[in-house]
A protein has these predicted regions:
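N-terminal helix-turn-helix DNA-binding core of bacterial DNA-binding proteins
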Residues: 2, 6, 10-49, 71-85, ...
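Short, charged, intrinsically disordered terminal tails
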Residues: 107-117
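C-terminal structural segments of small proteins and small subunits
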Residues: 84-108
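Short, hydrophobic-biased segments on the C-terminal half of alpha helices
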Residues: 57-58
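Alpha-helical residues within the helix-turn-helix
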Residues: 44, 61-62, 67
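Short, intrinsically disordered, low-complexity terminal/loop segments
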Residues: 1-3, 116-117
Length: 117
């Protein structure tokens, strides 16, 4: 495996791990809908504490899905779509591979059915 493919694989892994948690998915939805938002504002919309929101945002940040920008005493978080785009490309390639395999199986099955007549 090349270093570039390994790097993409690690990026996809961290994104999928981050997205595995429903609270983190909710945070991404809120950030996508509202733009830059503080952890305090996000916590007001979720059934978790501000501290829990900050921990979830740290996981999302480590995966490259969000970024924080300090404005005075606050940190405002926003979605960073690049990591999600890379994951979507990986998933699309995986889906295309499975589509090709299923088409091959269908072709073999149809040929076997024709030959049995």
């Amino acid at each position: 495996m090349t270093d570039e493919r390994r790097d993409v694989g690690e990026e996809v892994d961290s994104v999928l791990v981050a997205l595995a948690d429903p609270t983190r998915r909710q945070l991404l939805d809120l950030l996508a809908a509202q733009g830059e938002v503080t952890a305090t504002r996000l916590a007001e919309r979720l059934p978790v504490s501000r501290q829990a929101v900050v921990k979830h945002l740290a996981v999302l940040d480590a995966a490259g899905l969000v970024s924080g920008r300090r404005v005075g005493r606050e940190v405002r978080y926003a979605v960073r779509p690049a990591a999600l785009d890379a994951t979507a490309r990986w998933m699309a390639a995986l889906a295309a591979d499975w589509d090709r395999r299923l088409a091959d199986i269908k072709r073999v099955a149809e040929a076997a059915e024709r030959d049995s007549r």
